[in-house]
C-alpha cells in the first residue's frame, strides 16, 4: 500500500513524496506527524510510521531542496529534559524521540565545510550562509570589530542589494538585528562598507564572501558545550575541522588536532579527551551538568573526529566509552567523511537547481525586519500552537571581552574585505576614542555560547547552579546555629556513633558464629560465602601482584599493551600516583620520627 507524504512550508508550496509502507491495519494506526523547521524558518511536514528511520527525513528534506551535497547537514531535536540530540539516520525515529507526536525538529548544518571554495553548488553555499547568519545572531561566532562590520555588511548586501539613498534611510541598518546587541559605531561601519565596498555584488557573491571570511575565524563551526574543568572554571568545548577546542571566555586555551586525539570517552558526567600535546600524552577531564549532556558531547566528538580525520568511511570503527571493568556505550558514525564529500561534489555535473531566497526586502518596517531575523530560534517541542513549546531567546547577560583590533592578524591577500574595511576607518571622534580605549563587550560584539546550547540562555551564575550539589550548598549556608543547637547536634552524633559500633559488634559476632558452626545455615549459602571469601582473597593477592608487574620495568608484550590503554593511564595518574605519594610521605615521616627518637 502506498501513501503520500505532504510537505507544506507555511502554506506556500506543496510537494508529494511516495513512501512504501506495510498494508497492515496496525501500521496505519501508527502514523505520526513530523514537522521540520528549515534554515529560513519555513516548515515542511510529513507523516511517518513507527519503523521509519531518520534517513527518511533527511532524504525527504534533500529532495525538497534538490540538495546533493547533503552530508554537511543533519536534523536536530530536543528532548523533554531540554537536551539537544542529532537524529541518527540508521535508527527508528520513534525510538529516538522521547516525546509524544506530533514531533518538531530542525534542519541544521552538522559538519561545517573546512574550505567553502570546494562547495560545488550555490544552493549548498546559500544554506551554509543561512546557518552562519544564525550563528552570528546567537553569538556563536567570535570575531574582531572589523570582521564583525564586514560580516554584517555582507548580510545587508545579500538581503537588500546595493545601497540606494532613495530607498535606504539614514538608520536603515538599525532595522537589522544582525548581532545580539550592536552599537551605533558598529552600525556606522556596516553602512560604510555596504555603501563603498560591496556595491555591485549579487546575493550569491555577497554570501560567498561572508563564508570566506567566517571560515577563517576560530569559532567557525563551534557548537559550544558548557562544562566545568578540574578547577571548577566554566569552559566551552567544541569540535571543528581542525580538532577539539576549549574556550574560556573569549580565549581558546586548548586545540588538539584530530590526528593527536587518541580517545574520547565519558563516565557519568565526566568527559575525557586523551591526546598528545607537545609530544606528551595528556588527558583532559571536563564535567557536564547531566549524564545525558555528557553522552551527547561524546557522540558529537566521535562523529566530528570520524568526519574530519579519516580518508575513507571504511576506516571508521565502532568506538566504546569503555570503563575499566564494564563495557560502556558503543557508537559508530555511519556517514561519509569530509574527503569523500568533497570528491563527490567535484563529480556533480547537473544543471544547478534554482535557489529560492527568503525575500525580506518587501517590507522596510523595523517590526517586519526584526521579526524575520529574530525568529531564527532553535525549536524545542511541537509547533507554536503547543503551549509546551520553548525557543531560544536573546542572550540576557553581559558578554565577555573580545580581542582588540590590533591583536588580529592581518589578512593574507590584498583583496581581503577586512583590509579594505580598515582603509575606510571613521575619523576618530570623542565617543569612539573612548570606546577604543576599552575592550569590546557585548554592546558591540558578543560571544555568549551558552545561548546556543541550552534552550534558555544562561550566564555563569546560572551554570554554577547547574553544577551545585547539596554538599556544596550545605557548606555555603550561613552558620546561624546557637550554642545549644551545636551541643545537641554533638550529643546526637555521639549516640549515633555508639549505635553503629553496637551494630558492627553484632555483625562480627554473627559472622564468627557462622564460621565456627555455632549457627546452622543453608549449605548453599555457606558454600557461596566461602567462595566469596576465597574470591576476595585471590583478588587481594592477584591485584597487587598485577599492579606491581605493571609498574615495574618488565618488558612483556601483554604488559606493554595494558600500560598503553587509556583506562590504565587514567588509573595510574588519578589513583596510583597520588596513593603512592601519600604512602611514601607517611613512611618517610615515620622513619624520620624513629630516627629522631
Swiss-Prot record:
PANTHER family: 4.1 G PROTEIN, FERM DOMAIN-CONTAINING PROTEIN 3. Residues 423-432 have a biased composition (Acidic residues). Putative tumor suppressor gene that may be implicated in the origin and progression of lung cancer. It is a single-pass membrane protein. Residues 409-435 are annotated as: Disordered. This is FERM domain-containing protein 3. One of its GO terms (molecular function) is cytoskeletal protein binding. It holds the Pfam family FA. It comes from the Eukaryota. Its main location: membrane.
Amino acid at each position: 500500500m502506498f501513501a503520500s507524504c505532504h510537505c507544506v512550508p507555511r502554506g506556500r508550496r506543496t510537494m508529494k513524496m511516495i513512501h512504501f509502507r506495510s498494508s497492515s491495519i496496525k501500521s496505519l494506526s501508527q502514523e505520526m506527524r513530523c514537522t521540520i523547521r528549515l534554515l529560513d524558518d519555513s516548515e515542511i511536514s510529513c507523516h511517518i510510521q513507527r519503523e521509519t528511520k531518520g534517513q527518511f527525513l533527511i532524504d525527504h528534506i534533500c529532495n525538497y531542496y534538490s540538495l546533493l551535497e547533503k552530508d554537511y547537514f543533519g536534523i536536530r531535536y530536543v528532548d523533554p529534559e531540554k537536551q539537544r540530540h542529532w537524529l541518527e539516520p540508521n535508527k527508528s525515529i520513534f525510538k529516538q524521540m522521547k516525546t509524544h507526536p506530533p514531533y518538531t525538529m530542525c534542519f541544521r548544518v552538522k559538519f561545517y565545510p573546512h574550505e567553502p571554495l570546494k562547495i560545488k553548488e550555490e544552493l549548498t553555499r546559500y544554506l551554509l550562509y543561512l546557518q552562519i547568519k544564525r550563528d552570528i545572531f546567537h553569538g556563536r561566532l567570535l570575531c574582531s570589530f572589523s570582521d564583525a562590520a564586514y560580516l554584517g555588511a555582507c548580510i545587508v548586501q545579500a538581503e537588500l542589494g546595493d545601497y540606494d539613498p532613495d530607498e535606504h534611510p539614514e538608520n536603515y541598518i538599525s532595522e537589522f538585528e544582525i548581532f545580539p546587541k550592536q552599537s551605533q559605531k558598529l552600525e556606522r561601519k556596516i553602512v560604510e562598507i555596504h555603501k563603498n565596498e560591496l556595491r555591485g555584488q549579487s546575493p550569491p557573491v555577497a554570501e560567498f564572501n561572508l563564508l570566506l571570511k567566517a571560515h577563517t575565524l576560530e569559532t567557525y563551526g563551534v557548537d559550544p558545550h558548557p562544562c566545568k574543568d578540574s578547577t571548577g572554571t566554566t569552559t566551552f568545548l567544541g569540535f571543528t575541522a581542525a580538532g577539539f577546542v576549549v574556550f574560556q571566555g573569549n580565549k581558546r586555551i586548548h586545540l588538539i588536532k584530530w590526528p593527536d586525539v587518541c580517545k574520547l570517552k565519558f563516565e557519568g558526567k565526566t568527559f575525557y579527551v586523551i591526546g598528545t600535546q607537545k609530544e606528551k600524552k595528556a588527558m583532559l577531564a571536563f564535567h557536564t551538568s547531566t549524564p545525558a549532556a555528557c553522552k551527547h558531547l561524546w557522540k558529537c566528538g566521535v562523529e566530528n573526529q570520524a568526519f574530519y580525520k579519516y580518508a575513507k568511511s571504511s576506516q571508521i570503527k565502532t568506538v566504546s566509552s569503555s570503563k575499566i571493568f564494564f563495557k560502556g556505550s558503543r557508537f559508530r558514525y555511519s556517514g561519509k567523511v569530509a574527503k569523500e564529500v568533497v570528491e563527490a561534489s567535484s563529480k556533480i555535473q547537473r544543471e544547478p537547481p534554482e535557489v529560492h531566497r527568503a525575500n525580506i526586502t518587501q517590507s522596510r518596517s523595523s517590526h517586519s525586519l526584526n521579526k524575520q531575523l529574530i525568529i531564527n530560534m532553535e525549536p524545542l517541542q511541537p509547533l507554536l500552537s503547543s503551549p509546551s513549546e520553548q525557543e531560544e531567546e536573546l542572550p540576557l547577560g553581559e558578554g565577555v571581552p573580545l580581542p582588540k583590533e590590533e591583536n588580529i592578524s592581518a589578512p593574507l591577500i590584498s583583496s581581503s574585505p577586512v583590509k579594505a574595511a580598515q582603509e575606510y576607518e571613521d575619523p576618530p571622534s570623542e565617543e569612539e576614542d573612548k570606546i577604543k580605549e576599552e575592550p569590546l563587550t557585548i554592546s558591540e560584539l558578543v560571544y555568549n555560547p551558552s545561548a546556543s546550547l541550552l534552550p534558555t540562555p544562561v550566564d555563569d551564575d546560572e551554570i554554577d547552579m547547574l553544577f551545585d550539589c547539596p554538599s556544596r550548598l550545605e557548606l555555603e549556608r550561613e552558620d546561624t546555629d546557637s550554642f545549644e543547637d551545636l551541643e545537641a547536634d554533638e550529643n546526637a552524633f555521639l549516640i549515633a556513633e555508639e549505635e553503629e559500633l553496637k551494630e558492627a559488634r553484632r555483625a562480627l559476632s554473627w559472622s564468627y558464629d557462622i564460621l565456627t558452626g555455632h549457627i546452622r545455615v543453608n549449605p548453599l549459602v555457606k558454600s557461596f560465602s566461602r567462595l566469596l571469601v576465597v574470591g576476595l582473597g585471590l583478588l587481594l593477592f592477584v591485584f597487587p601482584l598485577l599492579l606491581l608487574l605493571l609498574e615495574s620495568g618488565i618488558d612483556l608484550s601483554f604488559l606493554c599493551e595494558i600500560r598503553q590503554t587509556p583506562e590504565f593511564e587514567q588509573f595510574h595518574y588519578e589513583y596510583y600516583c597520588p596513593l603512592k605519594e601519600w604512602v611514601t610521605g607517611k613512611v618517610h615521616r615515620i622513619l624520620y620520627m624513629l630516627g629522631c627518637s
